[in-house]
């Protein structure tokens, strides 16, 4: 009897812990921690404000000389860059499938309270077909991300959905406010 009770209890616990949301995120690793209270980057700040949903920011990294920079581009035509500090370099960074194209973060405008989304900046359909990370999405002011190769469009405000293919690769993200810490940890 005790073994049956323990087994049923475990089964109920496991069944209740597997929410639909837990399957919504990619199994691809992504890791990024950025303290915007130190950098005060206006482009990132605009995307991390839940009171201005629909603003999205691409974050990617690149080198200028021997220095690493983080680049921020919003769908509202803002572009900034910040030189990485020693504290930025300490934790392991995995900015999506390809760090040179990065991730896209922002609050969707279709729910209240607004939902923070974090997507890979690669077209998931082209990436799945070729297994190559050569398909950086463009992001428009209306919150639509487009692939120039396959012409598919993805709704950044609506969980990265696509009318005719896979939805965007989605990562877990939290933030403590526009001038707080952005944490992507998948």
Feature names for model-found ranges:
Residues 1-6:
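Bacterial N-terminal signal peptides that target proteins for export
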Residues 132, 154-159:
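Iron-sulfur (Fe-S) cluster-binding segments and ferredoxin-like electron-carrier domains
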Residues 126, 150-151:
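Short Cys/His-rich metal-coordination motifs, predominantly Zn2+-binding knuckles/fingers
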Residues 11, 116, 140-143:
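Residue-level signal for mature regions of secreted extracellular proteins and peptides
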Residues 138-150, 161-176:
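Short cysteine/histidine-rich metal-coordination sites, predominantly Zn2+-binding motifs
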Residues 23-137, 170-186:
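N-terminal pre-ligand scaffold of iron-sulfur
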Residues 18-22:
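Bacterial signal peptide processing site
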């Amino acid at each position: 009897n005790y073994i049956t009770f323990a087994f049923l209890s475990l089964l109920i616990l496991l069944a209740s812990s597997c929410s639909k949301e837990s399957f919504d995120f990619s199994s691809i690793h992504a890791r990024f921690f950025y303290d915007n209270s130190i950098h005060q980057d206006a482009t990132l700040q605009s995307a991390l404000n839940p009171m201005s949903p629909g603003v999205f920011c691409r974050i990617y990294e690149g080198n200028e000389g021997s220095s690493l920079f983080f680049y921020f581009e919003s769908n509202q035509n803002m572009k900034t860059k910040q030189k990485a500090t020693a504290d930025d370099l300490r934790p392991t960074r995995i900015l999506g499938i390809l760090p040179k194209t990065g991730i896209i973060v922002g609050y969707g405008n279709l729910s209240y309270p607004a939902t923070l989304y974090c997507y890979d900046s690669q077209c998931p359909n082209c990436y799945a077909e070729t297994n190559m990370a050569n398909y950086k999405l463009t992001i428009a002011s209306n919150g639509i991300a487009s692939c120039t190769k396959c012409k598919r469009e993805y709704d950044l405000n609506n969980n990265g959905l696509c009318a005719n293919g896979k939805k965007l690769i989605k990562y877990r993200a939290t933030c403590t406010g526009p001038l707080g810490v952005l944490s992507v940890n998948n």
